Regions:
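Transmembrane alpha-helices
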Residues: 137-153, 254, 291, 310-342, ...
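Transmembrane helix-loop junction
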Residues: 159-163, 260-261, 288, 292, ...
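A hydrophobic, multi-pass inner-membrane permease signature
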Residues: 235, 247-254
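Non-cytoplasmic
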Residues: 252-284, 325-359
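Residue-level signature of the transmembrane alpha-helical core
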Residues: 21, 132, 144, 148, ...
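Gly/Trp-centered helix-boundary motif
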Residues: 1-155, 159-230, 234, 314, ...
Length: 401
C-alpha cells in the first residue's frame, strides 16, 4: 500500500506541486493577500483585526464597528496600520485616480509604491492583480465543487449500474405504483407544486407530505398480494440510456440556457450545473471498472460470505474503481475552470459583483489597447488548465503501468 501511494505521489513533479499549493493558498487566503483594510491596526489606542472582523460581520456573528469604514489609503490620524496585506486593494475596490485603463508600465497617481497597480487597472480603476487573486479563489471553488459533485453522482450511479446490471435488481409492483402516483402529484398543476415557494417551512412541509404519501401508498399497496410480486429492473440499460441522452446534449450550451433560471448565479449554482454535465463521464468509467471486477474471485467470495450489497460496494468494490475516478477528477477540475472562465467571458457566469479571470478578459475585449486585462488572466487560466491536464496524464500513465 505504501509503495502504491509513493508511486502516485511521484506523479507530482516539483513545479506542479508548487502551482497547486500556490493556487490553494490564494483560494483560502485571498482576503489576506489582497484587501483594502489592514490585517492588524491600532485605532484609538486599541488593536484590531479588520479582515477577521469583517468575516464576522458578513456572517452576522458580531456587530459592525466604526473602524471598518476606513481604507488603507483613506483613514484618520489615529488609525495606524501595523500589518498590511501584500496588495492594498480588493478585486472590487475602485481607485478613481487611476481609472480609464492605467497601464502597468505607465504613470499612475499614487502616494507611494505600496499603492501601485503592478498589473494595471480597468476602466473603473479596479486593480488587475487583485482581480487575479480573487479570480483564482473563484476558479478553485468552482473547479473543486463541480468535480466533487460529479464524482459523488458518477460513483453512485456507476457502482449501482455495474454491480446490479440488468438481472440483479428487483422492485415490487406496489413500490412502482406508489412512485408513479407521487410523481403525478408533483407534476400536477392543480395544486401548485410547479410554483416555487419563497417560504422554507412551506417547502419542507410539502416534501414531508410527499414522503408521507409515498410511505402510506407503499404500505397500502403491499397489502395487495398481486402488488407484492417483484419485477426486474434493468438498471444498466437505464443508466446507458441516461448517459446517451447526456452525450447528445451540448453541455456548454445547455448550461448557458439553464443559468437564467437561477435568481442569483453564485459559485454553488454554477458548480452544480457544471457538475451535472460532468458526472456521466465519471459514471461511465466506474461502470466499466465495476463490470470488470464484479465476477472476479474476490467479489464472488464476499457474496458467498453473505455480506450486504452496501458493504460489498463500499469496502470491496470502491477501492478498485477509485484510480480512474482520480484520473478523471484531474481533467475535470481543469475543464470546470475553463467552462467557468468561458461563461464569465461571455457575461453569463457569476454575478456582476464577482471578479473572475473571465470577466477580466471580457473587460480587455472591450478596449483592445488594455492588453494587460487579457494577457495576465489568460496566462493564469492557461497555467491552471495545463497543470490539471499534465497531472491527469501522469496519473493515467501511473494507472496504466
Amino acid at each position: 500500500m505504501r509503495r502504491g501511494k509513493d508511486r502516485w505521489y511521484r506523479a507530482y513533479p516539483g513545479w506542479i506541486r508548487w502551482v497547486l499549493i500556490g493556487w490553494f493558498a490564494l483560494a483560502i487566503l485571498a482576503p489576506f493577500v489582497a484587501n483594502e483594510r489592514g490585517l492588524v491596526i491600532r485605532y484609538r489606542e486599541e488593536i484590531h483585526f479588520p479582515v477577521f472582523h469583517q468575516w464576522g460581520v458578513d456572517a452576522g456573528i458580531i456587530p459592525h464597528q466604526d473602524y471598518l469604514r476606513f481604507r488603507l489609503h483613506e483613514h484618520p490620524q489615529d488609525y495606524q496600520i501595523l500589518i498590511g496585506p501584500l496588495i492594498p486593494y480588493r478585486a472590487e475596490t475602485l481607485d478613481a485616480s487611476n481609472s480609464n485603463y492605467r497601464s502597468p508600465l505607465g504613470h499612475q497617481e499614487i502616494s507611494s509604491w505600496y499603492y501601485r497597480h503592478w498589473l494595471g487597472t480597468d476602466q473603473l480603476g479596479r486593480d488587475t492583480l487583485a482581480g487575479l487573486v480573487y479570480g483564482a479563489r473563484t476558479a478553485w471553488w468552482v473547479g473543486m465543487l463541480a468535480t466533487a459533485l460529479s464524482i459523488i453522482v458518477g460513483l453512485f450511479f456507476g457502482l449501482i449500474s455495474g454491480y446490479y446490471g440488468n438481472d440483479r435488481a428487483f422492485i415490487s409492483r406496489g413500490s412502482v405504483l406508489a412512485g408513479c402516483v407521487v410523481l403525478l402529484v408533483v407534476l400536477s398543476e392543480d395544486i401548485g407544486w410547479s410554483h416555487q415557494s419563497t417560504q422554507t417551512l412551506e417547502v419542507l412541509l410539502k416534501w414531508g407530505l410527499l414522503v408521507g404519501l409515498f410511505l402510506l401508498l407503499l404500505f397500502g399497496f403491499h397489502r395487495v398480494p398481486s402488488l407484492k410480486k417483484r419485477i426486474g429492473v434493468p438498471i444498466d440499460r437505464m443508466f446507458l440510456a441516461v448517459i446517451g441522452w447526456f452525450k447528445s446534449l451540448p453541455g456548454l450550451v445547455v448550461v448557458m440556457a439553464l443559468l437564467p433560471l437561477f435568481k442569483h448565479t453564485g459559485i454553488w449554482s454554477l458548480a452544480l450545473l457544471i457538475g451535472l454535465f460532468r458526472w456521466p463521464l465519471i459514471g461511465q468509467y466506474v461502470r466499466a471498472e465495476m463490470l470488470r471486477i464484479r465476477h472476479l474471485p474476490f467479489m464472488e467470495s464476499v457474496r458467498l460470505l453473505g455480506l450486504s450489497d452496501r458493504r460489498i460496494l463500499i469496502k470491496h468494490a470502491l477501492p478498485n474503481v477509485w484510480p480512474p475516478v482520480i484520473v478523471n477528477a484531474a481533467f475535470g477540475v481543469g475543464a470546470a475552470v475553463a467552462v467557468e472562465s468561458a461563461l464569465s467571458f461571455l457575461g453569463l457566469g457569476l454575478g456582476l459583483d464577482q471578479v473572475t479571470w473571465g470577466t477580466l478578459m471580457n473587460a480587455g475585449r472591450n478596449y483592445f489597447p488594455a492588453w494587460w486585462l487579457t494577457v495576465f488572466p489568460g496566462i493564469a487560466l492557461f497555467i491552471v488548465v495545463y497543470v490539471c491536464n499534465v497531472l491527469g496524464d501522469r496519473w493515467l500513465a501511473q494507472y496504466n503501468s
